[in-house]
């Protein structure tokens, strides 16, 4: 069996994602479609609108054969680290190819990645935004800048892939959904951005939402609790007001001095949005601040995140019979640990950061995210 891989968030899974899943299989004629998916906390520093188990099940119902969780210590990082974590997992699973969406798939990402490889160390620090440092280095090396989010992520996939001993085939395809910044759903459209889908769901605009998401996603959004940052604001505010500022300074992605600003603004802010707007300055993007806020909420220190990134692992969230057969084929040669459930030892050691992240999410979601959870086993028929 041969496998194609996708690196995803599915926040939530919409028609553009279903198109991506089906195109991945059709382009590669792969026997197994493997999805690496962020857990309950996402790359833009925010909670997933639906929990990871619901989103994994939706993926299996819409074309995935195997869903692997991208650990929180990669899932909540800037693009280059998010990409590295996902590429590592797909490579470990012996994927032949990786398919991903880009705004401009015609770009020669391989040439750009090769040209800038020697400069990577110059944009892996947190003193300025990743995008700013990245584009400065890319402009100096190639004369090209990448401004679209998925073009930048595509570049990062190429950069991560070329560090592998056996690089995979990378296949960028044109995104079918609207641009991420688009916040409205166009009339008579079957595709919408993730931002527009989330806003419609949170506003309970079901009429606008129904045409742009699969039926099972629509059911999940209309019947389950939907999470947003405002739900977690009291917990974040408590952390910032009670944790010693020296400890706050150790949180992942925290820039020097930002911990004092965050603590001061937490004294007066009444909502999460109010807090972020008060902390915002020209030096930091909203996404960067949300990632720091996520690290503060989950008490993720830079030291423990960097240590964990050196010990990636394969956490199975679900599979179809094809996915199960593929796992059986490769499991004896896996270079990374494979986990299907969390026990006491894993909770305290190897998977402790993901357990912590899930436990905080569970405060609002109300559903166990790790303990007593078994991977989904879905014999799915795609209509």
Curated annotation (Swiss-Prot):
What Pfam family does this protein match (any one)? HIGH_NTase1
* Leader sequence residues: none
Positions contributing to ATP binding: 7-20, 101, 150, 175
Catalytic activity entry:
cytidine(34) in elongator tRNA(Met) + acetate + ATP = N(4)-acetylcytidine(34) in elongator tRNA(Met) + AMP + diphosphate
What's its job? Catalyzes the formation of N(4)-acetylcytidine (ac(4)C) at the wobble position of elongator tRNA(Met), using acetate and ATP as substrates. First activates an acetate ion to form acetyladenylate (Ac-AMP) and then transfers the acetyl group to tRNA to form ac(4)C34.
Q: Which InterPro entries match?
A: Rossmann-like_a/b/a_fold, tRNA(Met)_cyd_acetate_ligase
The organism encoding this protein is Lactiplantibacillus plantarum (strain ATCC BAA-793 / NCIMB 8826 / WCFS1) (Lactobacillus plantarum)
The UniProt family comment states: Belongs to the TmcAL family.
HAMAP family documented for this protein? TmcAL
Gene3D superfamilies membership: HUPs
Alphabetized UniProt keyword annotations: ATP-binding, Cytoplasm, Ligase, Nucleotide-binding, RNA-binding, tRNA processing, tRNA-binding
For this protein, what is the EC number?
A: 6.3.4.-
**CC per GO annotation:** cytoplasm
Which GO BP terms, alphabetically? tRNA modification
Question: Where located?
Answer: Cytoplasm
For this protein, the parts annotated as crossing the membrane are: none
- Predominant localisation class: cytoplasm
Name of the protein this chain belongs to:
tRNA(Met) cytidine acetate ligase
Q: Which GO terms describe its molecular function?
A: ATP binding; ligase activity, forming carbon-nitrogen bonds; tRNA binding
- Reading the lineage from the top rank, the first entry is Bacteria
């Amino acid at each position: 069996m041969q496998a194609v891989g996708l690196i995803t968030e599915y926040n939530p899974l919409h028609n553009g994602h279903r198109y991506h899943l089906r195109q991945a299989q059709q382009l590669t004629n792969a026997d197994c479609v493997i999805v690496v998916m962020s857990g309950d906390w996402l790359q833009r520093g925010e909670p997933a609108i639906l929990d990871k188990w619901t989103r994994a099940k939706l993926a299996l119902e819409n074309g995935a054969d195997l869903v692997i969780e991208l650990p929180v210590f990669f899932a909540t990082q800037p693009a280059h680290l998010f990409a590295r974590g996902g590429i590592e997992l797909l490579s470990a699973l012996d994927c032949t190819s990786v398919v991903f969406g880009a705004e401009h798939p015609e770009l020669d990402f391989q040439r750009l990645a090769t040209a800038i490889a020697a400069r990577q160390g110059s944009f892996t620090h947190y003193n300025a935004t990743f995008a700013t440092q990245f584009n400065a280095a890319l402009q100096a090396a190639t004369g090209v800048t990448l401004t679209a989010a998925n073009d930048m992520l595509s570049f990062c996939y190429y950069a991560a892939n070329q560090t592998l001993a056996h690089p995979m085939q990378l296949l960028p395809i044109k995104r079918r959904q609207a641009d991420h910044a688009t916040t409205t759903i166009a009339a008579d459209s079957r595709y919408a951005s993730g931002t527009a889908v989330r806003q419609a769901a949170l506003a309970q605009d079901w009429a606008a939402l129904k045409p742009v998401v699969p039926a099972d996603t629509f059911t999940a959004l209309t019947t389950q609790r939907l999470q947003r940052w405002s739900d977690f604001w009291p917990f974040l505010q408590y952390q910032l007001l009670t944790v010693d500022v020296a400890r706050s300074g150790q949180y992942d992605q925290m820039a020097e001095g930002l911990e004092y600003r965050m603590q001061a603004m937490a004294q007066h802010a009444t909502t999460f949005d109010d807090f972020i707007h008060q902390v915002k300055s020209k030096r930091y993007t909203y996404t960067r601040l949300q990632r720091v806020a996520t690290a503060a909420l989950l008490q993720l220190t830079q030291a423990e995140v960097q240590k964990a990134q050196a010990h990636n692992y394969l956490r199975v969230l679900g599979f179809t019979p094809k996915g199960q057969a593929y796992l059986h084929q490769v499991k004896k040669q896996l270079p990374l640990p494979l986990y299907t459930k969390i026990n006491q030892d894993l909770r305290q050691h190897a998977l402790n950061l993901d357990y912590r992240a899930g436990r905080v999410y569970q405060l609002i979601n109300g559903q166990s995210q790790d303990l007593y959870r078994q991977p989904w086993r879905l014999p799915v028929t795609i209509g």
